[in-house]
């Protein structure tokens, strides 16, 4: 059956089919060929789940996160808004169908900025959005969120006109994807579990990804070293041990023969995770005792551990392993691609190349649409100047004409924005206003002339310059 060709196969899918069938259909009331059911009902459901669960290669967002970004752009959310209220606004404006609680969690996730969360959060949280030690945020009615200062630098409003629009029951909703100035799917990472597919992408450094973009724009290709996973503030190590396989280690130092101090945990461990681990190790006789010196005010870990005598004789690497300070993660690069299809990428580099090519395509569209916009503005300013100047110089006499005759006169002189021109207030038909109109026209023509020199490379470079400036000192 063709369904297994695009949602995977195996015992997990057989169980999914069983659950779907008995949750959605009463056996005595519904009869259908198994192959028809699998190729239609189940396949549609599976694809919908996957589209909700997997990040998009272009903007790194799942469907719900994109709805939040869409509403933030639409509302120009520059002032903090209660998370519970923002969730309600997203539901109203983007046809979100899965309830407030789930959406509030999405908003919180977009704002979290501790080590192991977002390397570049899209929203700025006001209140307790969780920390690395204690990730649980406060209730949504007590915390607020707004756009980050660099939000519109990542999602340039000039690109909005070129986004692929979507509609639900006649209402416009979020676009299929955005084309941010940075590859957010690699910078912030992402996870997702769908039907027959899963995704696990680790975060990368913002600075490294900017370096990769700048070098790629210059035609340089040997950039694999910049795709190493990295989290802001992480003091441990990340070592490649296989294809897309990484060994993430915390930090441990000896304090005498049988004592060690742990000052960093491997991502994504939390304080609570490691406290449970230490109790298990103590019960198993691997360690004798431990004390917790972690500091919640600085979100830093500190554990002093007394080892069992036999454990103390081992090497540092063996002790690190026994104390669960080494975590192995294999990345799985499954994303929704630009064609809205599920695609399993082989590496972070392949994801970047797909993102880069589509982004360049949309920068060319930006140049075309901005050139068209500026040309229209020049045309409007030119007509305004010609009209006011004509009235001032007496070439266009308006005082003894009715509106219909005036419109005919303007048409004969090649004017097009007639309604706007005939609605100008009388005080604008003066010599000084004519000069102001000429100055505005000259400025706009110069702006258009300069913009005609732009290329996708120069536009992207300007975006990166602005983002780097906004991120300084962050």
What positions do the PLM features span?
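Catalytic phosphate-handling regions of large nucleic-acid enzymes and associated NTPases
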Residues: 21-243, 304
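Charged, surface-exposed alpha-helical interface/stalk elements
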Residues: 219-474
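Aromatic (phenylalanine/tyrosine) cluster motif
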Residues: 4-6, 18-25
């Amino acid at each position: 059956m063709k369904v297994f060709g695009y949602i995977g196969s195996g015992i997990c899918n057989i169980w999914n089919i069983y659950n779907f069938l008995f949750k959605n259909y009463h056996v005595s009331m519904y009869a259908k060929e198994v192959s028809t059911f699998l190729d239609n009902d189940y396949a549609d459901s599976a694809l919908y789940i996957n589209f909700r669960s997997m990040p998009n290669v272009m903007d790194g967002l799942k469907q719900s996160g994109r709805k939040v970004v869409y509403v933030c752009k639409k509302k120009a959310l520059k002032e903090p808004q209660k998370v519970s209220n923002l969730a309600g606004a997203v539901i109203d404006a983007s046809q979100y169908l899965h309830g407030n609680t789930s959406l509030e969690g999405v908003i919180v996730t977009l704002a979290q900025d501790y080590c192991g969360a977002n390397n570049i959060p899209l929203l700025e949280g006001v209140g307790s959005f969780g920390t690395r030690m204690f990730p649980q945020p406060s209730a949504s009615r007590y915390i607020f969120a707004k756009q980050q200062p660099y939000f519109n630098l990542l999602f340039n409003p000039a690109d909005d006109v070129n986004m692929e629009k979507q509609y639900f029951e006649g209402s416009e909703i979020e676009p299929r994807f955005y084309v941010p100035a940075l590859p957010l799917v690699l910078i912030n990472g992402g996870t997702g579990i769908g039907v027959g597919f899963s995704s696990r992408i680790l975060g990368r450094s913002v600075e490294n990804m900017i370096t990769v973009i700048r070098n790629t724009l210059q035609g340089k290709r040997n950039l694999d070293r910049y795709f190493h996973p990295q989290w802001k503030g992480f003091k441990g190590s990340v070592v490649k041990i296989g294809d897309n396989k990484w060994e993430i280690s915390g930090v441990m130092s000896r304090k005498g023969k049988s004592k060690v101090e742990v000052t960093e945990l491997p991502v994504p461990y939390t304080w609570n995770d490691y406290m449970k681990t230490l109790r298990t190790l103590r019960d198993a006789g691997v360690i004798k005792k431990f004390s917790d010196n972690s500091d919640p005010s600085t979100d830093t870990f500190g554990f002093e551990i007394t080892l069992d005598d036999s454990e103390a004789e081992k090497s540092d690497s063996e002790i690190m392993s026994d104390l669960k300070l080494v975590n192995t993660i294999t990345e799985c690069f499954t994303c929704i691609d630009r064609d809205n299809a599920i695609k399993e990428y082989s590496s972070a580099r392949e994801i970047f190349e797909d993102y880069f090519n589509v982004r360049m395509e949309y920068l060319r569209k930006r140049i075309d649409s901005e050139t068209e916009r500026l040309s229209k503005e020049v045309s409007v300013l030119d007509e305004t100047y010609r009209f006011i100047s004509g009235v001032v110089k007496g070439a266009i006499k308006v005082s003894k004409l009715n509106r219909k005759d005036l419109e005919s006169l303007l048409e004969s002189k090649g004017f097009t924005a007639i309604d706007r021109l005939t609605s100008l207030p009388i005080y604008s038909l003066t010599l000084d206003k004519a000069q102001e109109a000429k100055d505005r026209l000259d400025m706009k023509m110069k702006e258009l002339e300069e913009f005609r020199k732009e290329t996708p490379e120069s536009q992207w470079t300007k975006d990166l310059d602005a983002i780097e400036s906004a991120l300084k000192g962050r």
